[in-house]
Amino acid sequence: DSYINQSATFHSDRTNLNIKRGKCDFSFFNISIGHKLSLSLQNLITNPFNYMAFTNNIMIVRHRLLTELVKLWKNGELTTDKIDRLPLELSPRRSKHAGRCCVHKERAVWKYKSLPLLGLDMDDETDELTPLSEYAARAIERANNGKPKDNIMCVIDEACSACVQINYEITDLCRGCTARSCQYNCPKGAVHVHADTGKAWIDHDTCISCGICHKSCPYHAIVYIPVPCEESCPVKAISKDEHGIEHIDENKCIYCGKCMNACPFGAIFEISQTFDVLQRIRKGEQVVAIVAPSILGQFSTTIEQVYGAFRQIGFTDIIEVAQGAMSTVEHEAHELIEKLEEGQKFMTTSCCPSYIELVNKYIPDMKKYVSGTGSPMYYAARIAKEKYPDAKIVFVGPCVAKKSEVADQKIEGNADYVLTYSEIRAIMKAKDVELEACPNDNQTASTFGKRFANSGGVTAAVLESLKESDNCIDAKVCRANGSQECKKAL
């Protein structure tokens, strides 16, 4: 289950093809931003929301809340006082409220966490007295009359715990040793020793968080305390305001979603488009799902049954993004040969919108080396619109960053909405769709197109396409998983 841009990592000998053409030395980069997703039995937690893998309780809580909201929508109660009572039902009187001061705070957190799931953000808040039903009515009105919000992510200030900005702390494990390596190696004299106990302490007004004391202590008594969301952000796009609440700088953010995955209090949300899609279905419009190949690893039933479940949700048709991937392969293979013949020394893939954001915002000199070919989502959307000219196209995948690609006004003919797998599963559960009972819905696509979800899959498909067209080259492939590897490689 993924709320972030993740690249499921599988290893295949097919990604290490040696293709030769004269003496040409060409480097081809396969780029994806995010975490490598390692699925194992230890990571799969049996829970009431079967078929999905959750990595922590935050995802379960988020999934539960969205499921309850969709149930209210299904029953026509989303804009009634039933939704106003939802926080009370989720946190009843005298219930445990771990990490919060009281049950009333917990209820406020439930309320404000509902806003991004409804497709709103904190800028849409009026005040604390505005009922959730009014926000839900606004969300439905916007879904009926307009486009989804352009901003991709937001911080729920009520849920943010305002983590203390102290990076190093000396614990009770300090033995008060004679060496005092921490004190004598501190470049700012920020480490002091208590006269009575001999134990060290840090003056945080002087400390510059260099970590030398941490490395110097032979007892490992000095610990590093991160601010998880800030620590996880590869481009430092999230920081505290004057009230200690985190804020995301949209001008810096690359929408990788790592901060959302890292926050232990679940205070960072993507702006969901769930109700935008559901309203289109309810109004009887044609709504076509284009599904990423990584869906093969998301459910325990057959993929044909999963597609059958999509039909029961109300989708007009299901088209595999792997079909669009083959258009990406063909165009990118031709582009590769053209740039090679023009004397360019390397080219990177362009399927990951987080990577594109990274290059545009932080390494603009590398833009000319990024492939200009459209992503598989783009070509799959074009296939869908050729078949259903009046339909709304919904990309279904694991990636938050795809919402930034959809919101990009410079890309015409792309998908209209994006749903994550967890959002799809919440809809299934709320609408009582049982996967095992769903009829099969067959789809076919190229094996190489489906391997786009693998690490190195894009490169392998492009090189295989060149091989089949007799345009063989001696290609040196460089993989980069995650933004740090991307920056290092470039």
Predicted segments with their positions:
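Low-complexity, intrinsically disordered or signal/transmembrane-proximal segments
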Residues: 3-6, 11, 35, 42
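Intrinsic low-complexity, disordered N-terminal segments enriched in polar/charged/small residues
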Residues: 11-16, 23
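Iron-sulfur-associated redox domains of electron-transfer enzymes in respiratory
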Residues: 35, 40-125, 131-132, 270-490
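Glycine- and small hydrophobic-enriched segments that form the cores of compact globular domains
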Residues: 164-257, 261, 266-273, 280-285, ...
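Compositionally biased, low-complexity intrinsically disordered regions
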Residues: 14, 26-28, 40
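Aromatic (phenylalanine/tyrosine) cluster motif
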Residues: 3, 10, 26-29, 49-51
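Ferredoxin-type iron-sulfur electron-transfer modules and their immediate structural context
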Residues: 47-216, 220-227, 489
